Amino acid sequence: MCGILAVLGCSDDSQAKRVRVLELSRRLKHRGPDWSGIHHHGDCYLAHQRLAIVDPASGDQPLFNEDKRIAVTVNGEIYNHEELRALLPNHKFRTGSDCDVIAHLYEEYGENFVEMLDGMFSFVLLDSRDNTFIAARDAFGITSLYIGWGLDGSVWISSELKGLHDECENFEVFPPGHVYSSKTEGFRRWYNPPWFSEAIPSTPYDPLVLRGAFEQAVIKRLMTDVPFGVLLSGGLDSSLVAAVTARHLAGTKAAKRWGSQLHSFCVGLEGSPDLKAGKEVADYLGTVHHEFLFTVQDGIDAIEDVIYHIETYDVTTIRASTPMFLMSRKIKSLGVKMVISGEGSDEIFGGYLYFHKAPNKEEFHRETCRKIKALHQYDCLRANKATSAWGLEARVPFLDKEFVNLAMSIDPEAKMIKPDQGRIEKWILRKAFDDEERPYLPKHILYRQKEQFSDGVGYSWIDGLKAHAEQHVTDKMMLNAGHIFPHNTPTTKEGYYYRMIFERFFPQNSAKLTVPGGPSVACSTATAVAWDASWSKNLDPSGRAATGVHDLAYENHVPIGNLKSKKMDSVSLGNAVGPQELTIRS
């Protein structure tokens, strides 16, 4: 992932302003440590921090059209860039970068070209011919993006809050699947799939079609000129990503450059479910497997850095981001710059355990629609920022546009969870890859119960976080929570603890509004809480809160009051710039 910052229509075009823009852009340097660039035209600045993945030698940004009157700063990967180049025979490209097509497509097709892009992206394009600009974000918000407005009438656009939060009077999340145009001074939705209306689809389920679509989604994401690997927790989603990657890697350009031996990575507490399952899958697939161990105290020591980088106070996201944040640093230290990950599957197929209680296929489908629309606030945010904190890029094939549109066109009756018929969560995805002749995975892995990432790294991780918060947030503080935090008032001590840290980094009112709120159980939306009356008594985002569903649900688990937060001797992470020494097993 790269980092982009644009300041458009500012009243000050002095050298001091340029220096300030560069200073703010450097706050995003963790996202793109390989190169930095800036383009200044009149009252507009485009800045870029580059993570070089495709064409590392010549793809520096900002990028331009032939006469340099159209400039663009991009964070993303355009997987169909070669096909798009073929549509532009009269254009000359300066680089081999996949993002180089954007300025030329705009010159040829105007603002509507965004629909032609297949990939993950956020960009700002400046047309100096008429001093206008557009900005756009990918369909699901895989890449992070924010927009703000200054008192001088300027528009600010940044990959992260930290690039603009103390320069703008007001700022907000740039909505996924939208284009912002200076000509209209407003947003237009460019991604309008049939499922977005939440109408109930009726296409029959075809396992081979679904399998083929996912394999193509993975193959697209093997476009790289740098070393890469896969994140492998041993759960269904990451295991399928690893299995398909391993099966199709040989013969690709990436394999010719870096070899066909796939590397896989897993993180967890000693003895965690993910470490055990991840190693088993890695052994089955023959990957070079790397395990990263952390302790509860390691994670607690990193919480402040995690909140600074992830830019949220959402409990679920912070729980899951912390081990991913720790793992990403170690992956990058091994020389890897890109990983393929399994985010998005649970939202598309109703994989969260609370979907067991969906009353009918209509409610099931509408909830999946709501979950996909909110991905940019949760799992996409985590996957993007936890990896980008260390200059690592995460690609997510389950959020391929074509794959999502296909999967969301299937009659949701096929997705319904029916234990009496042997259909557990994500049954249609499991069935699609249940190949007796050429198995992708062992049966017990293919049908392993869903674990949320924050649960799978080790159940004591969440319990340890709660115990730590108990020591730092008093009952009196909780009584006054509604007065201190009137918006999205924290309902638990853990939530209060995260909120205090967040507001120390991002004190503006606009910042707190960028984070979603509302009741949730096991990652549900507020609407789905009504599916089971008992859930309102235990609004915890852990999958174990889905009582009566998870094998290790909270009703069978040790209560938090019996746990103590304990200082571990093995590791101290310190702050973000200090060394972290996690145990590595390869």
From Swiss-Prot:
This is Asparagine synthetase [glutamine-hydrolyzing]. Pathway: Amino-acid biosynthesis; L-asparagine biosynthesis; L-asparagine from L-aspartate (L-Gln route): step 1/1. It comes from the Eukaryota. It comes from Triphysaria versicolor. Its EC number is 6.3.5.4. SUPFAM superfamilies: Adenine nucleotide alpha hydrolases-like, N-terminal nucleophile aminohydrolases (Ntn hydrolases). The gene is AS. GO terms for cellular component: cytosol. CDD domains: Asn_synthase_B_C, AsnB. Keywords: Amino-acid biosynthesis, Asparagine biosynthesis, ATP-binding, Glutamine amidotransferase, Ligase, Nucleotide-binding. GO terms for molecular function: asparagine synthase (glutamine-hydrolyzing) activity; ATP binding. Residues 193-516 form the Asparagine synthetase domain. The active site is at C2.
